[in-house]
């Protein structure tokens, strides 16, 4: 499972977070364009050099007719998104990581079995998106740890 996210660089507002079962460029573009509909088109975006961002870069260049609409580089230079990832892992990722690890230890989940992985994604991706990540989007990172269940 992969979580993609975006933050408004000015207000530091989380504009999208979505869990999915792949890291394809079209998968990243979908929540980005949803965020554009809700928050407007940004002047520019900053992203790392990952191939999963290619469609989003292309979209921005087409919308602005300029390559200056995309700034790429190391994500370590973007402290706000790094802080978000730390909080997401600390308060959401750890919960599911521990759950999935326990399922493996109890021989209820084989990560090499396609059926097991399909079922895991079918059950957990909607739950992660509709509860944990949705609450974070509504309330921001200050509410994140209130979402955590142990």
Where are these regions (language model features)?
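RNase H-like DDE/DDD metal-dependent nuclease/strand-transfer catalytic core used by mobile genetic elements
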Residues: 1-137, 144-149
């Amino acid at each position: 499972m992969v979580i993609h996210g975006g933050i408004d660089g000015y207000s530091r507002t989380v504009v999208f977070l979505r869990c999915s079962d792949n890291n394809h460029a079209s998968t990243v573009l979908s929540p980005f364009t949803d965020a554009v509909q809700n928050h407007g088109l940004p002047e520019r975006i900053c992203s790392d050099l990952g191939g999963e961002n290619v469609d989003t870069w292309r979209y921005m260049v087409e919308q602005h007719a300029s390559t200056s609409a995309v700034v790429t580089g190391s994500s370590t230079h973007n402290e706000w998104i790094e802080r978000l990832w730390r909080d997401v892992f600390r308060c959401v990722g750890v919960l599911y990581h521990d759950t999935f690890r326990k399922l493996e230890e109890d021989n209820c989940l084989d990560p090499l079995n396609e059926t097991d992985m399909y079922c895991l994604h079918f059950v957990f991706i909607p739950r992660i998106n509709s509860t944990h990540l949705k609450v974070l989007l509504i309330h921001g990172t200050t509410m994140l740890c209130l979402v955590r269940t142990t």
